[in-house]
């Protein structure tokens, strides 16, 4: 459950460390984003010589949340923190070339197959 002003970790090697959600995309008064939703973010903390820098405004897809994901069989998959993968603003393809940590099966849509293939573990 990600909303505006939520701080997230970054689960790729784009160079960003911490980002803040500034808008949940999809719908005019949409309040929350879950796993697989696209959000607009600004970079709050970045490493030197990364692909992105502090202050950049980009899109990102949420890959892990503390709230978790409920499956049709009733099971819930939760994580220790909120994490996202940065996307190119135009093509919505990942900026990084590696993904760190597990991602959920809910990302298996046409748009995010690249993230699924880069992830070390799909839950």
From Swiss-Prot:
Entry keywords, A to Z: Ribonucleoprotein, Ribosomal protein, RNA-binding, rRNA-binding
Pfam families, sorted: Ribosomal_L14
Molecular function (Gene Ontology), one example: large ribosomal subunit rRNA binding
SUPFAM superfamilies according to UniProt: Ribosomal protein L14
GO-annotated cellular components: cytoplasm; cytosol; cytosolic large ribosomal subunit
UniProt cross-references to InterPro entries, sorted A to Z: Ribosomal_uL14, Ribosomal_uL14_bac-type, Ribosomal_uL14_CS, Ribosomal_uL14_sf
Annotated phenotype, changing residue 98 to A: Reduced RsfS binding
GO biological process per UniProt: cytoplasmic translation
Quaternary organization: Part of the 50S ribosomal subunit. Forms a cluster with proteins L3 and L19. Forms two bridges to the 30S subunit in the 70S ribosome, contacting the 16S rRNA. In pre-50S ribosomal subunits interacts with RsfS, which may inhibit association with the 30S subunit.
NCBIfam families found in the cross-reference section: rplN_bact
Family named by the database record: Belongs to the universal ribosomal protein uL14 family.
Protein task: Binds to 23S rRNA. Forms part of two intersubunit bridges in the 70S ribosome.
Protein name: Large ribosomal subunit protein uL14
The organism of origin for this protein: Escherichia coli (strain K12)
Gene name of the encoded protein: rplN
